[in-house]
Design a protein with these regions (language model features):
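Transmembrane alpha-helices and adjacent helix-loop boundaries
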Residues: 1-179
Length: 179
């Protein structure tokens, strides 16, 4: 929402944030957060590092998805709200966001599935025993059953993605406007 703000410094700051974190691979950012931040005195446990990395990257994509949903709104809707005397926040909360959120259900579902899949990068830091891919890797190391264990992990990721996509379709049908 701040990317459409009438305050230029806010727009610029959020645009810079989105452009920066949208273009950094999750793995590169995770390595930076885990290994480079302690070099400058910022020490964070591994689990919060993975969560922080996923939040930084996925929130930049969510901002862009929402901006796309906002851009899909007919400008006449906003002009009508202005003519009724609504302030910027009134327009955003009463007119823009309800329509924009309706427009971005599927892109947000896709983003959520992507975040679930990207969480597998957590296996690359000592968080490995708490994350599915890391657990499978440990089982593979101790029992030498690489293909079956990674196949099962892949099936878990596919099943999770299908459940999320199904919930997304239900939500999309619920918020759909029939014309």
């Amino acid at each position: 929402v701040l990317r459409i703000s009438p305050i230029p410094p806010l727009r610029a700051a959020v645009s810079a944030y989105v452009e920066l974190f949208r273009n950094i691979p999750v793995l590169c950012l995770l390595i930076f957060v885990v290994f480079a931040l302690p070099e400058v005195g910022v020490v964070i446990d591994y689990e919060p590092c993975v969560v922080l990395t996923l939040i930084l990257v996925s929130s930049s994509f969510a901002c862009d998805n929402l901006r796309t949903g906002i851009n899909a709104i007919d400008p006449g809707q906003i002009e009508a709200a202005r003519s009724l005397g609504l302030c910027f926040m009134g327009i955003v909360t009463s007119v823009v966001l309800p329509q924009a959120l309706r427009n971005v259900v599927q892109p947000m579902v896709t983003l959520f599935i992507s975040v679930i899949i990207s969480s597998s990068t957590g296996a690359l830091v000592p968080l490995a025993h708490n994350e599915l891919t890391g657990l499978v890797s440990r089982i593979n190391t101790t029992d030498a059953m690489g293909i079956p264990t990674f196949l099962i992990a892949a099936l878990f990721y596919v099943a999770t993605g299908l459940v999320i996509a199904g919930v997304g379709r239900i939500v999309e049908r619920r918020v759909e406007i029939w014309r």
